[in-house]
Amino acid sequence: MLTDYLQACERGLEPLFSPQILSAVMALSRQRLVERPHGDLPRWMAALDALPAGPTNCALDQNTLTIGRAGEQNEEAVKLALQGLIPWRKGPFEFFGVPVETEWRSDWKWQRVAPHLSSLQGRRILDVGCGSGYHCWRMAAAGASCVVGIDPTILFLVQYLAVRRFAPDLPVWFLPLRMEELPAEGGQFDTVFSMGVLYHRRSPLDHLLELKGALCAGGELVLETLVVEGDECTVLMPQDRYAMMRNVFFLPSVAMLSRWLERCGFVDVRCVDESNTSVQEQRSTDWMRFQSLPDFLDPEDHSLTREGYPAPRRAVLVARKP
């Protein structure tokens, strides 16, 4: 199945990438999925294969991405197969009447972002750090001509394949890559999304320049990241952990982040949303049983993390490549 997917992916991306770039990204993808796969990949693929096959209705333009109808398949068998892909972090989904209540309400983020986007109709889109692909499917449903999601987490790719199993004709592709692994020659995309990635990067300016390089002239960047309150000189670098995460490096103020974007050559920079992350938006569920945001906050003061830093606050900025 993975070989078939990679072949279809290569055909689907031929109009987007030069032969040199396509060859490089597909070689790295094959290495990670076929030649030197993750040790749990056979188990995940067995769970995927246990899902029913064949065409069904898919509703991907709504908050809960819905595959099939209740009663169309054996719900217990579907649930057992989907449980083989736990933890589910980004969603929500419903497969044949089985709700998959993911850790994140990714639909809430989409509701904050979508009103401020240029029309996605006919656009070529890159979604960096795409997770399970939830937002990729929303972008396709909004009319994108091609959506490429990249994320190095192989389980997320298998979760994407669970949806693709029933929507094989949509132009949505997942590559198991990091942004810095895309070849430098770029400029293919009309819109680039980076949501929940920047604070994990040791060099945030390099990440912004990589995003800019992927955009065509006049293309739109949608950047969502953790921020702190303050002026254009304010940035938080945690001493060790932030919200129990060791891989968080820079949390700028919106003003500082705007300056970073401008220094990297973006224009028309604007902040379109800024909001605190609630324990209703990110929490443990039966489909993600590990610790989540409520465990990462000060138990007596949810305005602080366990380390005493300001609790997670996220901003969405939109900018343009001239």
From Swiss-Prot:
Reactions it catalyzes: carboxy-S-adenosyl-L-methionine + 5-hydroxyuridine(34) in tRNA = 5-carboxymethoxyuridine(34) in tRNA + S-adenosyl-L-homocysteine + H(+)
NCBIfam families registered for this protein in UniProt: PRK15068.1, tRNA 5-methoxyuridine(34)/uridine 5-oxyacetic acid(34) synthase CmoB
Family the UniProt entry places it in: Belongs to the class I-like SAM-binding methyltransferase superfamily. CmoB family.
Organism expressing this protein natively: Alcanivorax borkumensis (strain ATCC 700651 / DSM 11573 / NCIMB 13689 / SK2)
Record-linked InterPro entries: CmoB, Mo5U34_MeTrfas-like, SAM-dependent_MTases_sf
Catalytic EC class: transferase
A Gene Ontology BP annotation from the UniProt entry: tRNA wobble uridine modification
Molecular function GO terms recorded: methyltransferase activity; transferase activity, transferring alkyl or aryl (other than methyl) groups
Binding positions (carboxy-S-adenosyl-L-methionine): K90, W104, K109, G129, D151, P152, T153, M179, E180, M195, Y199, R314
Oligomeric form and interacting partners: Homotetramer.
Keywords: Transferase, tRNA processing
Pfam family, one: Methyltransf_9
Cleavable signal peptide: none
Documented EC number(s): 2.5.1.-
Top-level taxon in the UniProt lineage: Bacteria
Stated role: Catalyzes carboxymethyl transfer from carboxy-S-adenosyl-L-methionine (Cx-SAM) to 5-hydroxyuridine (ho5U) to form 5-carboxymethoxyuridine (cmo5U) at position 34 in tRNAs.
Protein name, per record: tRNA U34 carboxymethyltransferase
Keyword check for ATP-binding: no
